[in-house]
């Protein structure tokens, strides 16, 4: 349980960060997809969990909100919190994550750190996106 005062302090900070403070009197039916996504993010962070499980967190967010979310997740990571993320936005995942599990057609095809994946695919300068594309081309052969 969270004390009401603590919850309101956390919510206030997050509403400010995601530029929703002036929208408190709006009904959610009038929110855009991005605004709804921001509300879900705020709800997840207000409880201050030790593990964040986030599925496609960037979907529907504008570039500023994506940067805010990345900053917020980075702050939580520095506090020792764990983050399990499912995403198709590999450039952002590469910047944020320590290790990766790459799925293709519902099967685990590769896992490890970016350094380990680069070695596994013999692509020393590859991005995560490059590795994924190589993996899917290999699978198509």
Model-derived features: positions:
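Helical segment within the ABC ATPase nucleotide-binding domain
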Residues: 67-79
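Conserved ABC ATPase signature
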Residues: 27-31
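Conserved ABC ATPase "signature" region
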Residues: 3-23
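ABC ATPase "signature
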Residues: 111-112
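Catalytic Walker B motif of ABC-type/P-loop ATPase nucleotide-binding domains
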Residues: 52-56
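Conserved catalytic motifs of ABC-family nucleotide-binding domains
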Residues: 48
């Amino acid at each position: 349980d969270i004390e009401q005062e603590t919850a309101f302090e956390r919510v206030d900070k997050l509403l400010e960060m995601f530029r929703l403070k002036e929208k408190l009197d709006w009904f959610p039916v009038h929110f855009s997809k991005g605004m709804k996504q921001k509300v879900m993010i705020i709800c997840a962070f207000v409880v201050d969990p030790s593990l964040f499980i986030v599925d496609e967190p960037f979907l529907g967010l504008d570039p500023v909100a994506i940067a805010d979310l990345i900053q917020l997740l980075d702050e939580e990571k520095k506090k020792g919190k764990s983050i399990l993320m499912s995403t198709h936005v590999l450039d952002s995942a590469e910047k944020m994550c320590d290790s990766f599990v790459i799925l293709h057609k519902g099967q685990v095809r590769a896992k490890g750190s970016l350094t380990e994946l680069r070695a596994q695919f013999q692509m020393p300068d590859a991005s995560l996106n490059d590795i994924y594309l190589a993996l899917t081309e290999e699978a198509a052969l």
